[in-house]
Regions:
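Alpha-helical transmembrane segments of multipass membrane proteins
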Residues: 39-43, 113, 121, 155-159, ...
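Hydrophobic transmembrane alpha-helices of multi-pass small-molecule transporters
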Residues: 65-68, 180-184, 214-218
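Alpha-helical transmembrane segments of multi-pass membrane transporters/permeases
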Residues: 104, 159-186, 200-203, 207
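Short alpha-helical transmembrane segments in multi-pass integral membrane proteins
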Residues: 1-26, 81-146, 195-250
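Transmembrane helix-bundle signature of multi-pass secondary active exporters and lipid flippases
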Residues: 25-79, 107, 143-150, 244-264
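Transmembrane helix-loop junction
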Residues: 46-47, 83, 124-125, 138, ...
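Helix-loop interface residues and adjacent transmembrane-helix termini in multi-pass membrane transporters
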Residues: 36-39, 47-50, 84-87, 162-163, ...
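Small-residue-rich hydrophobic transmembrane alpha-helices
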Residues: 53-116, 150-169, 264
């Protein structure tokens, strides 16, 4: 008991909680903003029509399942990153980042291919209403291109969180949300001389927002981040030992999230 009390006295609890909240609050804001990008489509399309809203919402389920897989991929990457960040082994973190980006892009390409190549088939999984399917197909044929951008952004920014660069994601997601709101309003409702585009306008707004996220990520990665760099060779030449650890941490989460997502 005496040893325990001596140990607890050495902890600066005020500093501890300050550090925790410095990480937790920005991450909570990031998640809220990220959800807002998708929610903006739903809110604005609700004013256009029920069929349009239903089509976009059901089409969004494809992205939802993909996001769950991304969560599994980034979980494995962030666990490894946190371990090596404690050792200040930034070179290994770069290898983990490259591996995570490769895995995320593979998932994104598969989902983008499905969304662009067989959107009607995907929509029929969720509904048999031809009008809803038609609106969902319009949405998927545009928003499918954004999946690749999402892969880069989500993997990179989650790695940044693990090396204590949490405010980067907050700034990027905030700009993305504002852009999505503006482009959505202009294209969905035909403001500033643009034609009324409805569900296509919402899809273009989301695509522009996701593309802007990726551009900002790449600008930061190339010009500002001197600690952990994106190296193409790390995306192609995979470290077998790291790959095994990555799979051990990622696959259970991917399978769990995927089964849960398909069940809902």
């Amino acid at each position: 008991m005496e040893e325990k009390s001596k140990y607890t006295k050495t902890i600066n609890w005020k500093q501890f909680y300050r550090n925790v909240f410095a990480l937790v609050i920005p991450i909570a804001i990031q998640n809220l903003i990220n959800v807002g990008v998708t929610a903006t489509d739903v809110i604005m399309l609700g004013k256009v029509g029920e069929k349009v809203l239903s089509g976009a919402s059901l089409a969004g389920q494809i992205q939802y399942i993909m996001t769950l897989i991304f969560y599994g991929v980034t979980s494995g990457a962030t666990v490894l990153t946190a371990q090596y960040w404690g050792k200040k082994d930034t070179r290994t973190i770069e290898k983990v980042l490259g591996m995570g980006l490769s895995a995320g892009l593979i998932v994104a390409v598969v989902f983008a291919g499905a969304a662009l190549g067989m959107p009607e088939t995907l929509m029929r999984i969720y509904t048999s209403d031809p009008e809803v399917i038609a609106e969902g197909v319009k949405y998927l044929r545009i928003v499918g291109f954004s999946y690749v951008f999402m892969a880069v952004t989500q993997v990179y920014l989650n790695i940044m969180r693990s090396i204590e660069r949490v405010m980067v994601a907050t700034f990027i997601y905030l700009i993305s949300l504002l852009m999505n709101i503006v482009v959505n309003a202009v294209l969905i409702f035909g403001l500033l001389g643009f034609p009324v585009m409805g569900v296509r306008g919402a899809a273009i707004g989301t695509l522009c927002a996701r593309a802007a996220e990726t551009v900002m990520v790449l600008v930061y990665a190339i010009f500002r981040n001197k600690v952990v760099r994106i190296r193409l060779k790390d995306m192609v030449k995979i470290d077998k030992v790291l790959l095994k650890d990555f799979a051990v941490y990622s696959m259970p989460v991917v399978l769990n999230e995927l089964m849960w997502g398909l069940g809902t």
